[in-house]
Amino acid sequence: MREAEILLWIYVWFYIDWGINYYRESFFTRAGISPAKYDEQRFKDFLYSYTDSLNRYCCDIDTVSAEQVQEEIKLSYKKVSDVYGLTTPRSFQHPKILLFNSLYSGCGVLGFMGPFFSESHINMQITPLEYPFTYAHELSHLLGISSEAEANLWAYQTCLLSSDAEIKYSGYFGLFPYVLMNARGLLNEEDYKNWISSVRPEVINQYKEKREHWSSLYSPLLGEIQSAMYEFYLKGNRISSGQKNYAEVIGLLLSLPDEGIKKLAEN
C-alpha cells in the first residue's frame, strides 16, 4: 500500500506541476482557426516560399553562444500574443546539464522538459546549428505547450523573429526534416524531385552531417526502448498521433491564414 501511495502522489505531482497542460485548449482553439484540409497548391506555395528563405539564410554555424541564443529566443517569446496562452519566459530559466548525457544521445534525444521541477534540458552533444531551434522547442514546453507539433511551430517562429541571421537559419533548418517528410508523402515523384533539387546542396550536406552525427551516437536497443516508452507516454496524455505529432507542425502552419504563413515562412 505504501508503494501505491507514493505512485499516486507522483501522479498528482506530475499533473499539478505541468501535466495539466495536456488538458488545455488546442492551438486551433486559441488561435481562432480551424484545421486546414490538404490543398496541393497551398502546400506547394508554402514549400517553395519556405525553401527560398532556407536557401537565403543558409550558413555554416561552427560555434554558438548559449547565453546569447537564450536571450534572443526569450525576447522572441515575449513578442508572442497573449492569445496563444504562453507564459512569459523568466531570466532565471536556463537549460540544465544532463548527468548521463551519453544515454540520451544513445536514444536520439536532443532535449526534454522535466515536468516535476519545470526544468528544460539540452543534450550537450547537440550541434551548434541545432541548438537555437532545440532550445526554443524545449522552452515552449516550459511555457505551457504540451503538443510537440506546436512546440516545433513556436521554435520555428521564435527563431525567425530573432535579429540574428544564424538563429533564423537554425529555425529554417530545424523545420527541414518535417518539411522533407511531408513533401515525400504528399508530392508525386516528379514534383518531389523538382522541389528537392531546388534546395541548396549545402543544406542537404548539413542535413546529412547532422544525421551521421546522431547515428554515430545512437544505440538501437536504447532507442527502441525509449521510443516505445515515449509513444506510450504521449498517447496516454492526449497526443493520439504519438511521435508522429512532431511532423504535424506543417499542418499547423498551413492552417494559419495567408498572412500568418507569410509571417512564419518569409520573415
Identify what each model region corresponds to.
Residues 1-28:
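Transmembrane alpha-helices and immediately adjacent membrane-cytoplasm interface residues
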Residues 20-44:
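Alpha-helical transmembrane signal-anchor/signal-peptide segments
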Residues 37, 62-66, 121-125, 138-143, ...:
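Second-shell loop/turn segments in exported
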Residues 40-63:
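Short extracytoplasmic
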Residues 58-118, 124, 128:
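Auxiliary, metal-adjacent structural segments of Zn-dependent hydrolase domains
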Residues 133-152, 156-157:
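Active-site recognition of the HExxH zinc-binding catalytic motif
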Residues 156-188:
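Short helix/loop segments within enzyme catalytic domains
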Residues 203-267:
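Pan-zinc metallopeptidase signature
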